[in-house]
Amino acid sequence: AMDHTDAKNFLGLIEYGNQNINSAQNCYWLESSLTMFPVEQVELLCHLKNNDWKLSKTNVDTVIESMFIANSDGKSLYGKTGTGRVDDININGWFVGFITSNDNDYFFATNISLSENDNQFLSADGLSASKISLSILRDLGIYAYEYQSE
């Protein structure tokens, strides 16, 4: 397991957002002082895919493989969702990822959030962010993916 100091050092190595994990010793990835902008998420994914940090190839490959979602028309979709909750309400949704093909790689990050004026019964979560991302990627002709009904 990674202790607080190791986690802070690793976040510094990969330049993860503001690197501030002081407000929550064990849950810093949740709604806390650790923040990151979508463009920083895209930069992080580019560095991860290229292993610019010179981490163990096996570890990097394992992380990337864990992000695999689907193949379509010779393209592979990789992604990760995230949901921030406060008072049992989903207030922050993320979907970050990339698409690989023979011609090009595409990186993306979508963040949605609820404001104080939003209807309390709506939700900003990772699933919603992923649906928005995939709709945009489809509209741009980059990747066609359809969610299967549950």
Segments from the language model and where they lie:
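Mid-domain, small-residue-enriched loop/turn segments at the edges of structured enzyme/sensor domains
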Residues: A1-N50
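Structured C-terminal helix/loop/strand segments within mature extracytoplasmic catalytic/sensor domains
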Residues: A1-D3, V42-E150
